[in-house]
């Protein structure tokens, strides 16, 4: 074992005193308390000394108590005036009492029998009593004086003078905790001391002067302990979930996807439902499954030719379909709502025009009524995308989804389940296995129906998906509660591992 100068000095001091407090060691060695404690912890780790800690409850003055120790308690100051005047109106005490003290002084003087209180046409009159005239030193005065002199007093000692609750009730003092530390040398420490310890000051820094003069040969250079525990540093870093989103965005762009962007969180029902061939009487459009805007209530529809094609698809059908067979309402389509799924952006992009073949994606905030728990939020992020091309099939879609789950989320097991969406056929649900939560649904996907794509001006197959990217992040970041992604928990934010 290698001991430094401070450790040797502290060990020799403890050996001389056999048992000592930290304060005694500081006084004996003339080292500061931090250096002494550091040396004590090192010596204890080596088994050369034993450190004993005893916790004790203490009472210390508050800022108010410190003020009272200098200028006197409110009742003492009030009595000085009353002894001089015998009686005084409450307002006459304003020179010696603060506003908050004036409100309390009447009760204190009356409760302790120090003054009689009555009211006349001018206000409250305080008249000193015989007890007030002869008042001597009370327990509270003795306690205040003792605390002022010592700084801190044990609860046991102060309790012999006054009930601690009385001091705390008047906010004169508060309870704290003091740790008394004593150390004693062990047999191992005694053996080391008996062998002889050379106390030689160490040099912690090899300077150019020491090298040039050759004195480095004469001094003892303190070795660096690279295994010594140090204070953990928490450098600034990006929020873990933001890093995850940025990585996914970058990877998709590297794979040739084009990002779809939008400035607003609000959509008309036209883009959120109607353009996706979802009928206006569908239960998913009701308040139980979506949010609606109270004001403004309605937005604007796009150009008439697009609206008429969507109307035709709903009422009579397109691409050989019979449609939904009802009278489509433009008024219903104009209703505004927070976006319920990012697929609304896919519909906008298809109507705007796309490259064929082409790959598109977006990461957007969406809103749906739900019960908050560790896998569900009412406001969450969704990654939505589609691929358009002449020869695309459902199997291409399954391959993309599996790649998402395994490569991006880090899932080990993936399952596909048949599903239903009004705007895709066939449709599929993607689920992955989480070690803590079991099978977790990631999202839905399918081949856009021709009634939808033809109304939007697209003549080739389009495979599409909408995945809860928050759940992908749960897998990648190794968490079992989706709410942590948006948490202010400093411990998690500091300790979350960097990904990729």
UniProtKB/Swiss-Prot annotation:
UniProt KW keywords: Aminoacyl-tRNA synthetase, ATP-binding, Cytoplasm, Ligase, Magnesium, Metal-binding, Nucleotide-binding, Protein biosynthesis
Catalyzed reactions: tRNA(Phe) + L-phenylalanine + ATP = L-phenylalanyl-tRNA(Phe) + AMP + diphosphate + H(+)
EC number(s) recorded for this UniProt protein: 6.1.1.20
One GO cellular component term: cytoplasm
Transmembrane regions listed in the UniProt entry: none
Location(s) in or outside the cell: Cytoplasm
Top enzyme category: ligase
Gene3D superfamilies tied to this protein: Bira Bifunctional Protein, Domain 2, Winged helix-like DNA-binding domain superfamily/Winged helix DNA-binding domain
Entries under Pfam families matching the protein: tRNA-synt_2d
Entry note: cofactor: Binds 2 magnesium ions per tetramer.
Binding site for L-phenylalanine: 343, 382-384, 423, 448
Top-level taxon of the source organism: Archaea
InterPro entries documented for this protein: aa-tRNA-synth_II, aa-tRNA-synth_II/BPL/LPL, Phe-tRNA-synth_IIc_asu, Phe_tRNA_ligase_alpha_bac/arc, Phenylalanyl-tRNA_Synthase, WH-like_DNA-bd_sf, WH_DNA-bd_sf
Binding positions for Mg(2+) per the UniProt entry: 425
PANTHER family: PHENYLALANINE--TRNA LIGASE ALPHA SUBUNIT, PHENYLALANYL-TRNA SYNTHETASE
Complex formation: Tetramer of two alpha and two beta subunits.
Protein name as catalogued: Phenylalanine--tRNA ligase alpha subunit
